[in-house]
């Protein structure tokens, strides 16, 4: 019937929902967090590195943020076209996604919190 059965190593998130997963974690600068992602019919290990504290200015205001850089656990590019992602979450209890940046070999997409 075309159905496949896959073993799932615990909780698995899609590439977008991992941002919301991170919002509920006690994130510490310099620490790394591991989770599994389901994307393009594959389950992949993703390592999320908390790399910096930065002040980010967007239309919604100025925020103290944690800079988060997810990488693939297998060393392969995380996104299509050799893409990389960076996420800036507000460094407070809300953990708002203030800025998300995706770079690929065809360009860069930047999303910023408006209000």
Predicted regions and their residues:
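Acidic, serine/threonine-rich low-complexity disordered tracts
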Residues: 24-115
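Contiguous hydrophobic, core-forming segments of folded domains
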Residues: 1-29
């Amino acid at each position: 019937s075309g159905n496949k059965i896959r073993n799932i190593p615990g909780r698995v998130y899609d590439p977008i929902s991992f941002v919301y997963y991170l919002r509920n974690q006690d994130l510490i600068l310099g620490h790394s967090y591991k989770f599994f992602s389901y994307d393009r019919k594959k389950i992949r290990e993703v390592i999320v590195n908390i790399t910096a504290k930065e002040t980010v200015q967007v239309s919604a205001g100025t925020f103290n943020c944690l800079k988060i850089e997810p990488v693939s656990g297998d060393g392969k590019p995380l996104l299509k076209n050799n893409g990389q992602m960076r996420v800036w979450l507000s460094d407070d209890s809300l953990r708002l996604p203030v800025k998300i940046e995706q770079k690929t070999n065809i360009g860069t997409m930047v999303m910023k919190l408006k209000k």
